[in-house]
Amino acid sequence: MPERRPLGFGRHEAAAASAKDAPAVPTLDDKAAAALLPERPPRGHKGTFGKVLAIAGSLDYAGAALLVCRAAGRAGAGLVTLAVPESLQPLFAAKVVEATTMALPEDDVEEVDPEPSIARILDHDHDAIVLGPGLRPGLATTELVRMLLATPEDDAAPAPVVLDAEALRSMATLGEWWTGSVRPCVLTPHPGEFERLRTGAGVEAGADGDLSGDDDARRTAALAAAQTWGHVVVLKGARTVIAEPDGTVTTAPFENPGLATGGTGDVLSGVIGALLAQGLAPGPAARLGVFLHGTAGDLVRDRLGDAGLLASDLPDSIPLVRKRLVGVAERNKPGKRLGFTVRNGDGPAA
């Protein structure tokens, strides 16, 4: 495999050059990310660019849901709907601007009632789901997660789902959860969530080492999980690893301590959900989502430094990253390097 130069923005060359296995492990860079961008047809409408359903948030973690929704919008989703417990719908409806809200039925102790909630979710028009950020822990949430993974939409292929936070913690208690899942999934655990997941879900450790700092151990463990579960695993942290069931493992070049703050993972979930809704498969959506998120973090760090960055600082930089990637994609089209545009194979345009 030829050596790949890491991300532009002038920041990651040294880190990649010093990585002992850089020639053997694909590293995300601006050219690779640009090739993954979903189409944006000039005559597209809201439905063209995908509908995201975020099942997120609770009274204690309202911010997680708001971050998911804003990130999904900034990553290009045409429509975003936030599904929340019905007693909290007025609170969230007053906070979101571009997103709409949907009430999920509750039981008599104001927990989400899984069965009628699943019926309402499946009746909703969506192209991708983000499940977990800020959900209230408990048996009701665990059952909601189990049922959603196991129950397809009636009239379409099962919508893909991004699983984060409380969804992952619930799955760790479900044993071999993947055997009952009918949906394409992208799991986005941090190392602690990943350890709980693989301990409860029959994944051999695969490698000794620190899953926060040992790149070899992180790649080996993430790949073992992805191949056991049959779903994409995004093992977050410095130099995030994206592992796919087909054996593809990609390492992100980002090492930004400014992202070590609450809510940045919720932003990532929203970005990946938006890319799934725009038609990308789980692997490409995860790779491009990690790239957009990490580069947005670098842009914010350039302005603010590596301390004091807030998760809410990230979404507004995502369109700037995408705009740059569009330029990269244009420059890499056939004929561009020669200074002309090829039309219908007839040679240089006038």
Locations of regions flagged by a protein language model:
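Small-residue (G/A/S/T)-rich helix-start motifs and N-terminal tracts that mark the onset
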Residues: 1-161, 169-186, 191-350
